[in-house]
Amino acid sequence: MGIKIDGKRLAQDIREELKKQVENINNNEDVKLCMANILVGNDGGSQFYVRNQNKLCHALGIKVKNINLDECIKEEELLNIINELNNDNEVKGIILQLPLPKHLDESKITSAIDINKDIDGLSSISVGKLYKGEKCFVPCTPRGIIELIKTCDIDIEGSNAVVIGRSNIVGKPVAQLLLNENATVTICHSKTKNLKEICLNADILVSAIGKPHFITKDYVKEGAVVIDVGTSSVNGKMVGDVCFDEVIEKAAYVTPVPGGVGAMTTTMLIKNLCEGLK
């Protein structure tokens, strides 16, 4: 029987430390922590994430400028708003909720964010620095995943890691972070052949595909660490990519959904915000 990785507990431990950091920063008369949160349209998942961010920021004493924009906004208008925030000395971090409406150029807009305020690591420069192993803001969900893996009794260095999913937000950056930790990394996707055989070789298996209960015990190596990033709604209940109850019988460690990776994402955002002032 494996161990459930308690993301909520780890996130809470980190938040306690962050609260002290925020208090120290805010006690400095010249610096007050303030974050700008841009939401274009009314995507349900983004709205949920924004609410969680606001709740945590309020609890920690961080000011948030919520900028809610119509989904029909012109690209030039959005770029102007980002430029204003880049030049706003009060704002120490900017987060742009994704996905954006299809008429907006996501790459162009995320890259307009000042690299020193890009606390979700979305800009092309931030991505380039990540892949070169240089200091940068690391995307929040991938950073949270690495923090969770490091709580397990496994050496990332020298391990075989398999990442299912190649999104720019999770799959690609978490694969790069694992590579930076000297794991041997395989990225799988919808065109991958022999997926099950590849997964069975994984010491660390990260699934980020959004297919409910896709990963059964037949995909998991005995004693592996399994990180479930996927979220889907099934009969009004949030579930992950992994069949938790059967996989935990075979794996050494498994993250639940909810209560695993999701609990870490917002926490890593605030950690990035605080570290940006150092």
From Swiss-Prot:
GO terms for cellular component: cytosol. NADP(+) binds at residues 165-167, 190, 231. Its EC number is 1.5.1.5, 3.5.4.9. Transmembrane segments: none annotated. It catalyses: (6R)-5,10-methylene-5,6,7,8-tetrahydrofolate + NADP(+) = (6R)-5,10-methenyltetrahydrofolate + NADPH; (6R)-5,10-methenyltetrahydrofolate + H2O = (6R)-10-formyltetrahydrofolate + H(+). The keyword Amino-acid biosynthesis applies. GO terms for molecular function: methenyltetrahydrofolate cyclohydrolase activity; methylenetetrahydrofolate dehydrogenase (NADP+) activity. Belongs to the tetrahydrofolate dehydrogenase/cyclohydrolase family. Catalyzes the oxidation of 5,10-methylenetetrahydrofolate to 5,10-methenyltetrahydrofolate and then the hydrolysis of 5,10-methenyltetrahydrofolate to 10-formyltetrahydrofolate. This is Bifunctional protein FolD.
